[in-house]
């Protein structure tokens, strides 16, 4: 059993050597286990090797131009998997920012309504019942549990900010909420929190607009590139045909 485990660890270490620096951290943050990530990377490497082998076979039995495919296509495929993970991660982070903005918009009215009569823990419990996303609910429940275990520690609040959004603004907001917990009589904290939440929401809206504009701007480019690839493929086929005719003659 120990020998098998050692071999498995060694293989995973080799797989990780060929991974990009931030690949594992991105996949982990999106909720993937180490086993799932290692399986993804192993499959990615295997498919790349098979593509190279396929290109070599084409070059061996058909035309030497296919050797270029054996070099370029596997690299493109391997890189495209990383690009897909990056895009998925950016969409994941963007959704986390929006969900955190929803959390702050729910929180502020409850804080103003409760004043000093209700604890922050009770306010969080009310918000917990109104959350739809199970990831957000589990994260807030973890914060509530850590608040009970460490009532005077700010770390649970900053950890929640990192899990929920990870932005500097979200950390500042959760630190402000911690200050409110420690000094519940200070109403200025709520006003400051409202301003920070509005700024965070505005930033999220700006990101939505920028994202939509980027997709719109790249649409004509994608059409042109698709046409260019077809033209290049046709030209390469014609070139190979003429070169074959010359060799035969």
UniProtKB/Swiss-Prot annotation:
Keyword Membrane on entry: yes
Domain of life: Bacteria
Bilayer disposition of the protein: Multi-pass membrane protein
Transmembrane segments: 49-69, 223-243
Keywords tagged on the record: Cell membrane, Membrane, Plasmid, Transmembrane, Transmembrane helix
Chief location bin: membrane
Protein's UniProt keywords contain Cell membrane: yes
GO cellular component: plasma membrane
Cell location: Cell membrane
Protein name per Swiss-Prot or TrEMBL: Uncharacterized protein pXO2-22/BXB0021/GBAA_pXO2_0021
Organism: Bacillus anthracis
């Amino acid at each position: 059993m120990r020998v098998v485990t050692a071999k498995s660890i060694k293989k995973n270490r080799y797989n990780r050597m060929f991974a990009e620096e931030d690949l594992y951290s991105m996949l982990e943050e999106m909720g993937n286990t180490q086993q799932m990530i290692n399986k993804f990377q192993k499959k990615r490497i295997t498919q790349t090797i098979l593509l190279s082998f396929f290109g070599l076979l084409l070059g061996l039995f058909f035309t030497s131009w296919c050797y270029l495919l054996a070099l370029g296509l596997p690299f493109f495929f391997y890189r495209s998997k990383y690009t897909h993970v990056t895009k998925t991660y950016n969409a994941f982070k963007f959704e986390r920012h929006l969900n955190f903005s929803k959390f702050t918009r729910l929180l502020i009215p409850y804080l103003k309504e409760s004043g000093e009569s209700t604890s922050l823990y009770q306010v969080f419990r009310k918000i917990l019942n109104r959350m739809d996303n199970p990831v957000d609910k589990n994260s807030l429940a973890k914060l509530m549990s850590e608040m009970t275990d460490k009532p005077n520690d700010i770390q649970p609040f900053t950890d929640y900010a990192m899990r929920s959004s990870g932005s500097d603004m979200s950390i500042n907001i959760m630190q402000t909420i911690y200050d409110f917990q420690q000094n519940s009589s200070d109403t200025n904290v709520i006003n400051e929190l409202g301003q920070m939440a509005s700024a965070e929401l505005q930033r999220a809206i700006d990101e939505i607009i920028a994202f939509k504009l980027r997709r719109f701007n790249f649409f004509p480019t994608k059409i042109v590139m698709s046409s260019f690839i077809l033209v290049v493929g046709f030209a390469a086929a014609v070139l190979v045909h003429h070169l074959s005719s010359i060799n035969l003659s």
